[in-house]
Amino acid sequence: MPTYNKFYYRPLPEYLMLGASSIEGTGVFATAELKTDFDLGMTHLKVPILNGYVRTPLGGFVNHTDEANCYLVEKLDWDDYRVFHLYTLRPIKKGEELTLNYHLDEA
């Protein structure tokens, strides 16, 4: 078995893992204590050639709840492509599932 190389692709950061969710199927869980407004990573990126978005593993497994503990922030990357990052709304305990409210706020 090859040893881990920090330059290998890692679908989730070391402070996150996938696990069975009590909300729905598989969810994303913290493997460490996380502070408020902590950037958990990219969930989606706009790919103009595809005329749509690519979802990362982080974006694919965060479950919905009305009492979410995370939120999304839209940013522009180095090529001015739209990317979305997941941030914590409050301190997250080790073992806690990370959640989003999928409903868009109505203007």
Model-based region annotation:
Residues 1-107:
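Conserved catalytic SET/PR domain of SAM-dependent protein methyltransferases, capturing the structural core
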